[in-house]
Amino acid sequence: MLYWMLETGRSLHSGKKYYQRYIFYMIQSKLLVSSVMKKIFMGLSGFFLITFLVLHVSLNMMSVLSENSYNAISHFMGYNPIVQFIGQPILAFGVFFHFIMGFVLELQNRRARPIAYAYNNGAANSSWSSRNMIISGLVILAYLGLHWYDLWFQELNYKFIVKKVPNSARYYGELRDKFANPLRVILYCCAFILLGFHLWHGFSSSMQSVGLSNKYSLALSKFGKAFAVGVPSAFVFIAVFHYFSQL
């Protein structure tokens, strides 16, 4: 009888340990899946914003190439209901979703490796851009807030508060007026230089998040670095061009 009780106790204890391990494994599995899904959504939102950057720099470059074309495209986008009431809200959501997901993942990584952060020599194991994504992201988000206030809110005032008559020839002149201010040009250029550092790591990270980096890693890495340099440089060129062409 004593032997049976001892064996039963051992079995119950073993079963309890097994159950605890099972629960721990399930929690870890769910956390892993959750983390992977967050990274995938982070990568997809990054792709969305990269696509927007291509469209945005293409439109802005038209201001250098053709005043009439820039006015025509800007007027179309400014009064197209699909762009205004569907495209812009989606863009705003994409921006905030991307940054919120980035902050959440950064906090998760810091909690998961508290000791490693204390002893890890970051400069020896990763680039400056990868170690400071959250800093560059915060600065870019702050700049976007100013940029939206400067452009989007002024546009809302023009259309819905003052209710001025639509003028398709006003956009080029307004752009030139903004870039006549040297402080504005400096802030604009600094923001896009920082965006370049953000993209230097962010482009390849987005590829990795959606599973494209393994098969095309070398080509995508080269393209990502070219994109990180080329697109911000184009934005900087546009600002500098309009400033110096007015001196």
Residue ranges and their predicted role:
Residues 8, 16-17:
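Polybasic, lysine-rich low-complexity intrinsically disordered segments
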